[in-house]
Amino acid sequence: MLSSQFEVVRIDGEDYRHRGLPNAPSPLPDDAALDAAVEQHFAGRRVAIDDFDALVEHLSRVHPSRYRALIEGLDAIAWRGVRTIDQQAVALRFVVLADRLYDRDLPILSTGVPFDRVFTEEMMAGGYQKKYYRAVSRLTALAREADEA
């Protein structure tokens, strides 16, 4: 078997995609600050402003292949009340959304928990950890873009 010819070596460390970059911006403190940031950075542009719980609930009713259509024509995303996701199925759907947002390079503004806490510690250490770390990395990059807009 081919796999018997190789040794798996795990290399942990800083995400190379974020080396030399400023720290991820903190979530905005409240809805009023979110509204002001949307107006300041994205006035006159198409911004989807959603409650995080309503968003993840909606994702459960839409097939992931349709997530691209959900964000079609948008210039930015704003989420109110981002929280830690504690259900694996919900988290995996959210990963797909994060990938679609990253593919479209859509800046994200948010309130609630920072994106590095959107998945539980157990998820970040479990079988899908690569997916979760990728999603956190991508969401962080998109939050930086919004902060710089």
What do these predicted regions represent?
Residues 39-103:
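Conserved helicase/translocase motor-coupling segment
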